[in-house]
Amino acid sequence: MTQISERLLVQAHLAAKQPRVLSEQESAEHRAAIAAELKAQNAVLVAHYYCDPVIQALAEETGGCVSDSLEMARFGNQHPAQTVVVAGVRFMGETAKILNPEKRVLMPTLEATCSLDLGCPVDEFSAFCDQHPERTVVVYANTSAAVKARADWVVTSSCAVEIVEHLMDNGEPILWAPDQHLGRYIQRATGADMLLWDGACIVHEEFKAKQLEDMKALYPDAAILVHPESPESVVALANAVGSTSQLIRAAQTLPNSTFIVATDRGIFYKMQQLCPEKTFVEAPTAGNGAACRSCAHCPWMAMNTLERTLACLREGSGEIFVDPALVPRAVRPLKRMLDFTQAARLRLAGNA
């Protein structure tokens, strides 16, 4: 997908899919109705840290999960509910369905996609892989089910470095897709032989080093937290680099009282919940309005609203289906990731 067509697509979503603002009473009524439907349908709501705060709060209040994509996958896989409602973007719903083919997986909207997914079409990616058959194919979770089915491993940003180190120790050269910035970060961290696909996240690519330096001058005592999907020049300014869950832990453990945060502002809900005495400031992006494709908030994550969540439960709309022919091939690299991270957890527990 070209930069121009991607920009037009995102702006179309921003223009046409702006959610209706609910009154306080309407919001409370929707939350109560969603909670009742979840209970009646033996359903659980899982929400990503980048969703709007009202959705994250509802997931917590109803016994669901608010987490990064790795823990969303793990939670949906282990929870006994027969229906999983995934508030996030489409690849997260697909992942839940691949890992739980016997469960019903709903999403508030099927239009909530991801620029990384859009930028890695399976036909082009498969041809790229075929040109480099000697390489182990490692793909980021932010990809379609079809791309996952072409991979040897799936990773999230919270486990990517460890898995690539494991493969490097085995002497395996790697073909990486789709996020070029995360790929370069992993490459620098591990020294691995990695061939990178040319993709990027529209949210993180807009963070700018020069403006970040200027903001740091305004908050000289602030720590800078950066997601590794950001450009290298932004990562270089960070006091802590990591996945969403890792950045939240950094906010809890670093002694600073102020943080400049270079990731989607949806994460502020959990940071402020866990660190109410601390101040969190959005890192600067390319600007506002037409010049800014995301302005530190994913337009597709913003499509997960209370109204759409209630509608998907009442109407059964937004159900995720994955081609059964893809499932056995897509589940294999996902299970490898889950098994690897579970083993790593056990090793850490044993060393505690």
Swiss-Prot record:
Coiled coil: none
Keyword Nucleus: no
SS bonds (residue pairs): none
The family this protein is said to belong to: Belongs to the quinolinate synthase family. Type 1 subfamily.
Annotated metabolic or biological route of this protein: Cofactor biosynthesis; NAD(+) biosynthesis; quinolinate from iminoaspartate: step 1/1
Positions annotated to bind [4Fe-4S] cluster: 114, 201, 298
Free-text remark on how the cofactor is bound: Binds 1 [4Fe-4S] cluster per subunit.
Role of this protein: Catalyzes the condensation of iminoaspartate with dihydroxyacetone phosphate to form quinolinate.
EC number: 2.5.1.72
Keyword tRNA-binding: no
UniProt xrefs under Pfam families: NadA (PF02445)
Reaction equation(s) it catalyzes: iminosuccinate + dihydroxyacetone phosphate = quinolinate + phosphate + 2 H2O + H(+)
One cellular-component annotation, GO: cytosol
Entries under HAMAP family matching the protein: NadA_type1
InterPro entries cross-referenced by the UniProt entry: NadA (IPR003473), NadA_sf (IPR036094), Quinolinate_synth_A_type1 (IPR023513)
Name of the protein described by the UniProt record: Quinolinate synthase
SUPFAM superfamilies: NadA-like
Organism (species): Pseudomonas paraeruginosa (strain DSM 24068 / PA7)
GO biological process, one term: 'de novo' NAD biosynthetic process from L-aspartate
GO molecular function: 4 iron, 4 sulfur cluster binding; metal ion binding; quinolinate synthetase A activity
Subcellular location, record wording: Cytoplasm
Enzyme class (EC, first level): transferase
Keywords tagged on the record: 4Fe-4S, Cytoplasm, Iron, Iron-sulfur, Metal-binding, Pyridine nucleotide biosynthesis, Transferase
Binding site for iminosuccinate: 48, 69, 140-142, 157, 227-229, 244
Cofactors demanded by this protein: [4Fe-4S] cluster
